[in-house]
Amino acid sequence: MRKNFHPHMVNTPPSLFSEDQYKVEDAEAEVAAIIETPPSETEIDLEFLYTRDIEFRQETLYFIVVDRFYDGDPANSEGENAELYDPTRQDWGKYWGGDLQGIIDKLDYLKSMGVTAIWLTPLFEQIEDLFVGNAAMHGYWTKDFKRINPRFIANGEEPSLNKTQETRDTTFDRLIAELHDRKMKLVLDIVCNHSSPDVSGTKGELYDDGVKIADFNDDEQHWYHHYGEVQDWENEWQVQNCELSGLATFNENNIQYRNYIKSAIKQWLDRGVDALRVDTVKHMPIWFWQEFTGDMYNHKPDVFIFGEWIFSHPYDDRSVEFANHSGMTILDFGLCVAIREALAQGLEGGFHLIQDIFDQDYRYKGATELITFIDNHDMPRFQSLNSDPAILKVAITLIMTSRGIPCIYYGTEQYLHDDTNGGNDPYNRPMMEKWDTDSEIYRYIRLLSGLRRLNPAVSMGSQWQKYITPDVYGYVRRYRDSLCFVLLNRGEPVTIPEVETQLPDGEHTCVMTRNKYEVKDGKIYDLQLEERGVIVLSRVGERVKGQTIVRAQLNGVQTQPGEIIVVTGDCPELGNWDIARAYPMEYINTNTWFAEIPFNESAGKLISYKYAMWREGRSPLRENLMNRRWVIAKEGTVKWRDTWAPGRES
């Protein structure tokens, strides 16, 4: 069977695209072309609605706290209430002047580092008052979801999204244009769970483009829950209905609220936002998120959405259920904590703590789409736990080469950290100070971001542990005939007698150090690994090319060694129902198979297909369901997300 598959896997039809199938620019150009020719208001673009999906796994994210990044327009810093601004930058609870012009000014710095998407803290208009001495510089105390925070745009600029819908002449619109000109994406942080705390006798005053529509203290329309603070964090009802730190908590059962929040976020998407990061998702029921994400995908099918389930973990059934059934992926807190414990804190288990997380990937439908990180704005920075730049390099290499979508917290590349009070909030949000493009971590991120875009094994492939001790960790990423071998050392210099790489025999050059390594019989012998050293060896195989590429992901199928999942159907690309010519998928983990299927002859046509399990020496096991049907897009990239329908022995 493998012999039958081999020609089909490598002799794909000629490409209509550029040679570099994996460049972010290709996907961006496709999206731009669609945006430039939208359907009329009365026309529904059914092809776009049912055949497009965003591919975000090749991105390198960079998370920015807007107020603490760069002040590109000092004239707007005082804002409506000068009391909320500290020009000395000594009061950590007040605004320090960062704005959207500052981000525009530094886009070339970010682009050069290999950043392909920036995640910004919320840009909505905030309350202009102090709560326990703190201003809403973080963006999570919203007053009006349909207006831009005036502190982030130029003085006198219209903050209303409605009033600038036609002109699109705000600093925010210029940021979108500058990003897209550089083939970069914008991730907008949004908050659906709450509005604002009690300040000066007011709480939860909410506006719809300047018109007051809700008030926690005068809530006849029941826009808010009124159950007080969460007392028991193990009680799901309390977590979803009670207050978090005194914040007015929305009542998701109120259809007026749901219509308002969805219409607001759609306006931001219409202005060019590419992806959404959703705050505090564990504090609202999953049915709300299913409705919300469904509406967002119907409005903008190529939007990518991920949520913050604080301290999610693969052993936490509720967070796993959310990741699998909410319509969005999540931030991978489980891996983050394991990396911090193993590398920053040096816990005895070391890399075994990290492998324990990867061993649970089968619990997720989309483990390769989890957002990975080593720190953020809600915890001490990695370097506040361990200031050794060499161990930071190991941690960055890990998240940039292992499964998931890596996210770098602003300033990490410049070793930015303030260790006051252990680096806890608010000291984990210092002002960005340096812009050194020769910083070692800056250069590391640039190299590894390029690797992620060039080598599909790193962004989409399976991950296989090849060597592990508490101090040394080796793994292989594999997709089709592309490979990446990674070896990390958190400890002293060590010589490894032999380690399997799966690379072809011959000399290979480390992406990071340019050191040479000889592979024989797929292994490296007597490998010397320096103290806190890293080795990254890459081999890029033949790329999948076609007029339309379908990225098919199948979950829920249990296979044994030697069994292969294939896609069969009524078109030549899928073998015309001949199981011997069906298209083979790639094993990702025990819950996920994946394939990129090129379509040329059938592009733009309706096809039928189903999945089958090829078993050596036994009859194939086909799904027990009516054939799936799909209209293949005429060109570009499509994603199928399917769940195996248990087969029936014939």
Question: What is each residue range found by the language model?
Answer:
Residues 557-606, 614-634:
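Aromatic-rich carbohydrate-binding modules that target alpha-glucans
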